Amino acid sequence: VTAPLSERSATVTDAVKLQRRAERAAAGRFLAEGPNLIEAAARRGMVERVFATESAAQRYQPLLDGLAVVLVNERAMKLLSETVTPPGLVAVCRQPQITLDEVLAGAPGLVAVAADISDPGNAGTLIRLADAMGAAAVIFAGDAVDPFNGKCVRSSAGSILSVPVVCAPDTAAVIDRLRAAGLRVLATTLDGEATLDDVQGELAGRTAWLFGAEAHGLSPAVARHADRRVVIPMTGDVDSLNVAAAAAICLYQSAYARRSGALG
């Protein structure tokens, strides 16, 4: 039996490099940590290899059946892991490759666009919400976080593997493409000319929701490209919501309208 690899092994150090955005982009690979994410990636044939401590390999033996497993020592696992209490399993996975052209070719009915979102936790939650509400894709536009950042992958709870995710640096160009493809683009802003209640009747149609960054929302220049600027009506002592909360409200309203339209 081969001894577990140490933290100095080239196989381990090469995988650790995937914690960096540039390395992930160059390799087209990302790290999935923990049994739930690895099981979801394995179901889709994305797993290249799984690093496991000896105890984790025993505990999760049925999950690892049929996968390429590399045993590592505890110090190597600490390096590979990005969590406080490592579960003892980290997989190198192939990134799904999908383009905006491919998304639009499918005539999507609901799309979420995240512009300049830098917080990986919010980004992952947005992906999970989009999956739950039946969105056809999530587009990370502008200067946004890498959706395959470890925290984002974990926050998505595996949804990043089931809903198509596209990165596009030019937000205005993305909006123009969405509109040209027949989607109505609604931008969430604090100074919208319409409330979410006002547009409820329009939401059964093909819609792209545009959400801005956590701290300052959408820039006026970007919001101007949308078909409508929409504000979420709020009472109490609250004048803004974080991007995940705003997305949950808007995407649910769209999903509800689409269901009602299908039933009607």
Residue positions per predicted region:
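Active-site/ligand-binding-proximal alpha/beta "capping" segment
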Residues: 186-238
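Short, hydrophobic beta-strand segments that form beta-sheet elements in well-ordered domains
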Residues: 30-32, 49-54, 184-189, 209-212
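N-terminal positively charged helical leader segments and presequences
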Residues: 1-84
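RNA substrate-binding interface of SAM-dependent RNA methyltransferases
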Residues: 36, 97-98, 103-192
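Short, ordered loop/turn segments at secondary-structure junctions
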Residues: 55, 142-145, 215
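Structured adenosyl-cofactor binding patch, chiefly the S-adenosyl-L-methionine
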Residues: 91, 129-133, 147-160, 220-264
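Structural motif
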Residues: 52-56, 94, 116
